[in-house]
């Protein structure tokens, strides 16, 4: 038997050296797609991660199918097992007769059509790999095309006339994905000192962004489109990633925020002070400011709608719900004037 087995190894020497290349190739492709999907999920791109996970399942299934389909060509030769079983039955034969019997059985059992089957397996394997590759490319292209429709351009031209000003919440829903305003547009918004506008009031108002009270030395930035004002650093940080008012969600476009002023400060005007129609009207531009404060939602309805509150002004004009608190906007407007020249940045009356 010892002389028979070397002969068998010589007969199947070429088959023994052949290894299935689809096993490492499929494993490498599956691992690569899986790694890319995990990286996408970690970076917050869930849509691309889902596409890559689906592609991983397709690649893994195709790899298993190819391994099963090419098992005849790359796997163990069934004729070898059959010959070994028949050789064991003829152990009484001499080595020479065993070798002759082996050659006879090989000529009988191994048909010439095996080469055709091998070629067909290779062709099918190549076509399957091409189909898998094209499928992955199609999924990636479909995702990129969907992303381009959802996020066409980071900076879009917004026309405020297309939407009603009475529905700022609806405007915000249509423009959920924006990249905020440029720093130059933010700097063009007017700035004023809180203490100069509310000099006669005792109880301070609150900032709707940081939820803290205003102090007399705080600088506030005004949004002229809605007349709401916030802390300078609070609203600047907000507008870098959002192009809407944080309180009423009204959209801010380049046309209604740029005034060609740099580092401007607003000079306060009392409610009874009139702006002259001559030279003064050309030098300053009057704006109204709406401020408010937070009230707990646990308070009764009558307490929130008193005719006069602690500071002696009518509250509220409008109420904005913020979790367990409500932001009540004062019914009284504070009038301020914007200097038309950047050099007139000092506060004055």
UniProtKB/Swiss-Prot annotation:
Q: Which GO terms describe its cellular component?
A: membrane
Q: What class of enzyme is it?
A: transferase
Give GO terms for biological process. protein ubiquitination
Under catalytic activity, the entry for this protein gives:
S-ubiquitinyl-[E2 ubiquitin-conjugating enzyme]-L-cysteine + [acceptor protein]-L-lysine = [E2 ubiquitin-conjugating enzyme]-L-cysteine + N(6)-ubiquitinyl-[acceptor protein]-L-lysine
The Swiss-Prot or TrEMBL record annotates one GO molecular function as: zinc ion binding
Keyword set includes Magnesium: no
Q: Which PANTHER family match?
A: E3 UBIQUITIN-PROTEIN LIGASE RNF13-LIKE (PTHR45768), RING-H2 FINGER PROTEIN ATL47-RELATED (PTHR45768:SF18)
UniProt KW keywords: Acetylation, Membrane, Metal-binding, Transferase, Transmembrane, Transmembrane helix, Ubl conjugation pathway, Zinc, Zinc-finger
> Mind telling me which SUPFAM superfamilies this protein's record contains?
RING/U-box
Q: In which pathway does it act?
A: Protein modification; protein ubiquitination
Q: Where is the signal peptide?
A: none
Q: Which residues carry this modification: N-acetylserine?
A: 2
Domain comment, as recorded: The RING-type zinc finger domain mediates binding to an E2 ubiquitin-conjugating enzyme.
Q: What protein does this entry describe?
A: RING-H2 finger protein ATL48
As recorded in UniProt, its EC number(s) are 2.3.2.27
Instruction: Name the domain of life.
Output: Eukaryota
The residues that cross the membrane are: 21-41, 55-75, 121-141
> Where is it located?
Membrane
Per UniProt, residues of the HIG1 domain are 1-85
Tell me its family: Belongs to the RING-type zinc finger family. ATL subfamily.
Q: What is its main location?
A: membrane
Q: Where would I find the RING-type zinc fingers in this protein?
A: 207-249
Q: How does it sit in the membrane?
A: Multi-pass membrane protein
InterPro entries registered for this protein in UniProt = Hypoxia_induced_domain (IPR007667), Znf_RING (IPR001841), Znf_RING/FYVE/PHD (IPR013083)
